[in-house]
Regions:
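Anionic N-terminal interaction surfaces
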Residues: 1-27, 98-99
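Acidic, Ser/Thr- and proline-rich intrinsically disordered linker/docking segments
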Residues: 40-123
Length: 123
């Protein structure tokens, strides 16, 4: 996790990290950070972050028989304002986990977060 520490904001704390099929995902106290290794060697890397307060929907697909991986799809508000008169922009991020990883606990955490955000935004 040390190699990713430079991408943290001041006083941001890592709660948990995951090595995915090709990427690394960190969940901090503020956001979800996806380190997308690209190219044949994985030297090139794209870094995306999703503010935890913007997560509004989560879906999961467990691995089946064979070579399938498990997936968690995170839908989040990507526009700067959560309540915009002209509507908000929604984006989706798919995280692919190795077959052996049990995604249930992470799914539950993200779903509880999405539900709390939905309630807060719609008050």
């Amino acid at each position: 996790m040390q190699e990713y520490g430079a991408y943290l904001m001041t006083n941001e704390k890592i709660n948990v990290g995951f090595k995915l099929v090709r990427d690394v995902v960190l969940i901090t106290d503020k956001r979800i950070i996806d380190f997308d290794k690209q190219g044949a060697t994985g030297q090139k890397m794209r870094v995306d972050s999703i503010n935890l307060s913007s997560v509004i929907h989560v879906s999961a697909e467990t691995s089946g028989f064979g070579l399938d991986d498990s997936e968690i799809n995170i839908h989040y508000i990507s526009s700067p304002y959560f309540k915009a008169n002209g509507g908000v922009s929604i984006a989706e991020k798919k995280l692919e986990f190795p077959k052996k990883y049990n995604i249930q606990q992470l799914y539950r955490f993200l779903q509880e977060l999405a539900y709390a955000n939905h309630e807060r935004i719609n008050q």
